[in-house]
A protein has these predicted regions:
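Catalytic domains of riboflavin
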Residues: 1-134
Length: 134
């Protein structure tokens, strides 16, 4: 199997397209659909949940985690890979049940706004933030 060079992947992401990032076979041995959060559309979420069938996550920096007042999902993370899940989120306004592709895309766009505040989100929700580990 051949892999695309990183500059090509970055160009695809900048253009609003999804790419598949594959981790090591000695880790989870899986692929994740990755795209720029600021460009996510309901059709992208629909594709993810229809074809990838996993959780819809949002990678956030430590600074953004603090800005949004997100706390770890658990106090003691005993998961095999210690993935930094925070509590799940939903946009406080502009959503119905939160589960639709429209609602999830709206929640992501709400959470990444430069001036986003904790009051812009409710918990729990249908988007699962992951605090990035640099």
């Amino acid at each position: 199997m051949s892999f695309a060079p990183i500059p090509e992947l970055l160009e695809e992401i900048r253009a609003g397209r999804m790419v598949v990032i594959v981790d090591d076979e000695d880790r989870e041995n899986e692929g994740d659909l990755i795209m720029a959060a600021e460009l996510v559309r309901p059709s992208d979420i629909n594709f993810m949940v229809t074809h990838a069938r996993g959780l819809v996550c949002l990678s956030v920096t430590r600074e953004r985690t603090a800005q949004l007042g997100l706390t770890p999902m658990v106090q003691k993370n005993t998961a095999q890979f210690h993935t930094n899940f925070t509590v799940s989120i939903e946009a406080a306004e502009g959503v119905t049940t939160g589960i639709s592709a429209h609602d999830r895309a709206h929640t992501i766009r709400t959470a990444i706004q430069p001036n986003a505040r904790p009051s812009d989100l409710t918990q729990p929700g249908h988007i699962f933030p992951l605090t990035a580990q640099p």
